[in-house]
Curated annotation (Swiss-Prot):
CDD domains: TyrRS_core (cd00805). Homodimer. ATP binds at S214. It comes from Methanosarcina mazei (strain ATCC BAA-159 / DSM 3647 / Goe1 / Go1 / JCM 11833 / OCM 88). GO terms for molecular function: ATP binding; tyrosine-tRNA ligase activity. Keywords: Aminoacyl-tRNA synthetase, ATP-binding, Cytoplasm, Ligase, Nucleotide-binding, Protein biosynthesis. This is Tyrosine--tRNA ligase. GO terms for biological process: tyrosyl-tRNA aminoacylation. Its EC number is 6.1.1.1. The lineage of its organism: Archaea, Methanobacteriati, Methanobacteriota, Stenosarchaea group, Methanomicrobia. It is found in: Cytoplasm. It holds the Pfam family tRNA-synt_1b. A motif ('KMSKS' region) lies at residues 211-215. GO terms for cellular component: cytoplasm.
Length: 317
């Protein structure tokens, strides 16, 4: 897999691919970033962007991870002291998941977002962005707000200035970040900054086939125990032969196959013995043809996800 193919793997959108190709031709070591609001446990939805950062490192990028403690504070996720502690937990999780620590700069928002230069640029940007535009950007990231605070309207402006002052070439995020990233692309040039390239990953469904929500217990946290993961997978949605919006297949596609060249679905000999797959498309076809039972797929997924998360558990003990 060449450099560009690695970057494009498992992404929903690149804005724009032409600009990305130009960047790769111009810079040997470009810089990409993701900002994480430290507001709770890291789950497999977050890990999707971590996987993309690992791909980018393999493609020669230097990575910046913004641990956005000020953003979390503005978004009412706790005191600055509380979110700083969660940010440190996030950092340890990301390293345990495979980010090369030597090729990653971890930056706390509070280290640079409270300075005069930063705030002046936020104020300049606020003159160019309407209130409705800022609100629409935030509605995509979280739940729609009927009565937002001023701090929540400042949030997307800060995210755009983060991209500028961290001096990154590429902004990475889930597709829910698209409106904020487009705000940055449309306005940073007028403030004297470069226009960022944006890479967006899909939003994964919860294990029950609906949107992930802590109240539903339908997602995998990186510090879940082995027993918890097997329990969650056992009751996960996985209809026989159905490859559309199948959360178990999605875990294989986005989390397992990028880390393993070969996947073995273990089965007793009386049910045909083990199945070996060398690509996700091969596995998807096998499941569509009902060659794989949903429970065998679930058990195999749980086994591999536990292997991936085992280093995280060891770090957090």
């Amino acid at each position: 897999m060449d450099r560009l193919e690695l970057i494009k793997r498992n992404v929903q959108e690149i804005v724009t691919e032409e600009e990305l190709e130009g960047l790769l031709n111009k810079k040997e070591t470009p810089r990409a970033y993701v900002g994480y609001e430290p507001s709770g446990k890291i789950h497999m939805g977050h890990v999707l962007t971590v996987n993309k950062l690992i791909d980018l490192q393999k493609a020669g990028f230097k990575i910046t991870v913004l641990l956005a403690d000020v953003h979390a504070y503005l978004n009412r996720k706790g005191t600055l002291e509380e979110v700083r502690k969660i940010a440190d937990y996030n950092r340890r999780c990301f390293i345990a998941l495979g980010l090369d620590e030597e090729q990653t700069d971890f930056v706390y928002g509070s280290d640079f977002q409270l300075g005069a230069e930063y705030m002046l640029n936020v104020l300049k940007l606020s003159r160019a962005v309407t209130l409705n535009r800022a609100k629409r950007s935030m509605d995509e990231v979280g739940r729609a707000m009927d009565d937002p605070t001023v701090s929540q309207m400042v949030y997307p402006l800060m995210q755009a200035i983060d991209i500028a002052l961290l001096e990154v070439d590429v902004a990475v995020g889930g597709i829910d970040q698209r409106k904020i990233h487009m705000l940055a692309r449309e306005n940073l040039k007028s403030l004297g900054f470069e226009t960022p390239i944006c890479i967006h990953t899909p939003i994964l469904l919860g294990l029950d086939g609906t949107k992930m929500a802590s109240s539903k217990d339908n997602f995998i946290s990186v510090d879940d125990t082995e027993e918890e993961i097997y329990r969650k997978f056992k009751k996960a949605f996985c209809k026989m032969g159905d490859v559309e919006e199948n959360p178990i297949l999605a875990l294989f596609r986005y989390h397992i196959f990028p880390r393993y060249e070969t996947i073995v679905i273990e089965r007793p000999e009386k049910f045909g013995g083990n199945l070996v797959y060398n690509s996700y498309s091969e596995m998807e076809s096998g499941f569509a043809e009902e060659k794989v039972h949903p429970m065998d797929l679930k058990n195999s997924a749980a086994k591999y996800i536990n292997e991936i998360l085992d280093p995280v558990r060891k770090v957090l003990l």
